[in-house]
Amino acid sequence: MLSLRALTSDDYQSWKRLWDGYLSFYKTELSDEITANTWRELNDSKSLITGFVAEIDSKVCGIAHCFLRPSTWHPVGYLYLEDLFVDPESRGAGVGRALLNKAAEYGREIGAERLYWITKGDNAQARVLYDSFVKGAATGFIQYEYLL
């Protein structure tokens, strides 16, 4: 059975396995220091970053990390879903959609005006989910990135 909950400090081993899978999927390497800092932030009640896990039959199979960012256009701000990853063995079981719904529910609870995220253009499987979740209402905006 699929269930969702807030990430806790007891989830480290499961989270780390999925986090490593997520980084591998995006062919990204981060230092141990950044990973440790991310974990610390996810477990700090004063942090802006919030984490959720999905479980199937008590096994953690998906993670989502999001944070509220201020906006000049809305008094509360927008909830940014920075990371979403589902164990490949659990894909197709509704885990990704459930995590999106959990993030949206959290955003409504804190008064955010919208939930938003990005994905790679070639992430076809995720894009099918995202397009159906937003009912085809992609923003049409193009993201630019300038490394500092």
Residue ranges and their predicted role:
Residues 17-30, 72:
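Helix-loop element at the rim of GNAT/NAT acetyltransferase active sites that forms part
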Residues 53, 59-68, 80, 85:
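Conserved beta-strand in the GNAT
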Residues 2-17:
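A short beta-loop-alpha structural element at the N-terminal edge
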Residues 70-81, 91, 138-139:
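A conserved beta-turn-beta hairpin within the catalytic core of GNAT-like acetyltransferases
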Residues 108-119:
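Conserved GNAT acetyl-CoA-binding A-motif
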Residues 30-49:
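Active-site rim helix/loop that mediates acceptor-substrate recognition in acyltransferases
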Residues 97, 121-140:
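Conserved active-site alpha-helix within GNAT-family acetyltransferase domains
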